[in-house]
C-alpha cells in the first residue's frame, strides 16, 4: 500500500490548521437532551472526513439498525457506556473502545445506562451529515411518509 497522491504541492507548507475549543457550544441539541458538536465537517476537510462529538443525556436514545452505502462510520467512546450494534449483537462499549463500520455495515447505537455518555463519530469520506443531524433535531413529524423516505435516502440512511 502506498500513500495517496499529494494534495499540497507547495514547497514550504502553509498556516492552515483549525482549532475548536472544548467549551464551544454544540451546533445541535435534540429534544432528548443529546447534543452534537461539529469538530470537522466535510466542507472543512475538503471532503476527506467528518468528525463530530455526540453527547448523550441520561434518557435512553439512539438510532435503530441501519447502514450507509457511501460512507463508513467509526465510534470512539469518550465517557459512559454506549451500546453499539455490530450487525450481530449489541456491545457495551466504554471509554477508549473503538468500533469501525465499513460502508454497507449494519449498525446502531444507544445510551441505555441512565447516565450521560459521549463519543466521537467519524465519517469517511466526508458527507454533509450536518443536514441530517439538523433535520432530525427539527423533527420529521410534519413530513409525509414519502418526504421522510426521501430525507433518509438523501442522507444515505437505510433502515432495516
Set out the residue ranges of the language-model regions.
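Hydrophobic small-molecule pocket/channel-lining residues, especially in calycin-type beta-barrels
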Residues: 61, 68, 82, 108, ...
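A short glycine-rich, His/Asp/Glu-containing loop-to-beta-strand
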Residues: 25-65, 71-72
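Long, hydrophobic/aromatic N-terminal blocks
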Residues: 1-39
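Glycine- and acidic-residue-biased ligand/ion/polar-headgroup-sensing regions
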Residues: 70-82, 87
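A hydrophobic/aromatic-rich effector-binding and dimerization subdomain
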Residues: 3-12, 122-141
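Acidic/histidine-enriched, glycine/proline-rich intrinsically disordered or flexible terminal extensions
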Residues: 132-160
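Short acidic-glycine-tyrosine-enriched beta hairpin
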Residues: 21, 88-106
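Ligand-binding loop in jelly-roll beta-barrel domains
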Residues: 83, 103-130
Amino acid at each position: 500500500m502506498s500513500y495517496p497522491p499529494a494534495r499540497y504541492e507547495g514547497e514550504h507548507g502553509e498556516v492552515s490548521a483549525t482549532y475548536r475549543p472544548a467549551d464551544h457550544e454544540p451546533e445541535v441539541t435534540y429534544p432528548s437532551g443529546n447534543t452534537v458538536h461539529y469538530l470537522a465537517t466535510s466542507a472543512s476537510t475538503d471532503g476527506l472526513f467528518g468528525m463530530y462529538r455526540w453527547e448523550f443525556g441520561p434518557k435512553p436514545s439512539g438510532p435503530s439498525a441501519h447502514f450507509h452505502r457511501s460512507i463508513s462510520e467509526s465510534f470512539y467512546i469518550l465517557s459512559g457506556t454506549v451500546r453499539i450494534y455490530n450487525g450481530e449483537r449489541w456491545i457495551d462499549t466504554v471509554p477508549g473502545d473503538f468500533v469501525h463500520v465499513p460502508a454497507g455495515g449494519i449498525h446502531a447505537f444507544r445510551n441505555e445506562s441512565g447516565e450521560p455518555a459521549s463519543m466521537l463519530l467519524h465519517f469517511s469520506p466526508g458527507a454533509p451529515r450536518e443536514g441530517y443531524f439538523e433535520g432530525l433535531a427539527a423533527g420529521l413529524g410534519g413530513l409525509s411518509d414519502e418526504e421522510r423516505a426521501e430525507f433518509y435516502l438523501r442522507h444515505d440512511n437505510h433502515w432495516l
